[in-house]
């Protein structure tokens, strides 16, 4: 269907997707929260602040995923790769909304730097797509692998009674690994050690800032 759109139409659709990624409460999810109970866990003030910081990091990660996928789809050379990027971005919208919902429940908010995170990620995704589809897909695979690592770390850090956040992050982790496999199956190549290390360094800076702001 996207093939029938004019350049202007694609630009409008892309701009709309970008706005939805950075404006709170502008997306709807086709799937409910992946939780077994609607009851909110009882948390102390300190626990609530820590959980909010972790969920803000995860929300920021989903914003970055949107930027990355949108940027790669914008410059990808192969139509199948573009479709794969868009499909993954669509699934990540659910993750974005789930994190946003949990932040609301905690009386907190997304990172104030959300537009910056999105813009930087879009640029990285676009550059990766320009280099080659194989590099772009490898970039996705490595990103998802690193996201899975920090999701598992966050699950371990959550208070024992906060099964709500744990279930959300556990489902996200399953799907992040599926996106990694999809990227590899579409031809993604392993990245060099310097690129992987640089990605991890940038991700750590983002996490440190997003936890507080």
Curated annotation (Swiss-Prot):
GO process terms (BP): ubiquinone biosynthetic process
Keyword Cell membrane: yes
Cofactor (UniProt): Fe cation
CC per GO annotation: plasma membrane
HAMAP family, A to Z: COQ7
Record NCBIfam families: DMQ_monoox_COQ7 (NF033656)
UniProt family annotation: Belongs to the COQ7 family.
Protein name per the record: 3-demethoxyubiquinol 3-hydroxylase
Gene (name only): coq7
